[in-house]
């Protein structure tokens, strides 16, 4: 992702860790 979020959480999008959009991805 490219929204500049500094979170490091599991993300389905990256099949691992998404450093810049995990919160938004999870909330969807």
From Swiss-Prot:
Main localization (coarse): mitochondrion
The protein's assembly and partners = Homodimer.
What are the GO BP annotations of this UniProt entry? 2-oxoglutarate metabolic process; aspartate metabolic process; glutamate metabolic process
**KW Mitochondrion (keyword) present:** yes
- Quote a single Gene Ontology cellular component term: mitochondrial matrix
Relay the record's extra comment. In eukaryotes there are cytoplasmic, mitochondrial and chloroplastic isozymes.
Going by the entry's taxonomy, the superkingdom of the source organism is recorded as: Eukaryota
List cofactor names only: pyridoxal 5'-phosphate
What GO molecular function annotations does the UniProt record carry, in alphabetical order? L-aspartate:2-oxoglutarate aminotransferase activity
Q: What is the lineage of its organism?
A: Eukaryota, Viridiplantae, Streptophyta, Embryophyta, Tracheophyta
Role according to the record: Plays a key role in amino acid metabolism. Important for metabolite exchange between mitochondria and cytosol.
Identify this protein by name: Aspartate aminotransferase, mitochondrial
Q: Where in the cell is it found?
A: Mitochondrion matrix
According to the UniProt record, what class of enzyme is this?
transferase
Q: Does the keyword Cell membrane apply?
A: no
Q: Which family does it belong to?
A: Belongs to the class-I pyridoxal-phosphate-dependent aminotransferase family.
Q: Which reaction does it catalyse?
A: L-aspartate + 2-oxoglutarate = oxaloacetate + L-glutamate
Task: Name the keywords, alphabetized.
Answer: Aminotransferase, Mitochondrion, Pyridoxal phosphate, Transferase
Q: What is its EC number?
A: 2.6.1.1
């Amino acid at each position: 992702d490219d929204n500049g979020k500094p979170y490091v959480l599991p993300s389905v999008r990256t099949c691992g860790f998404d450093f810049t959009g995990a919160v938004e991805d999870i909330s969807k």
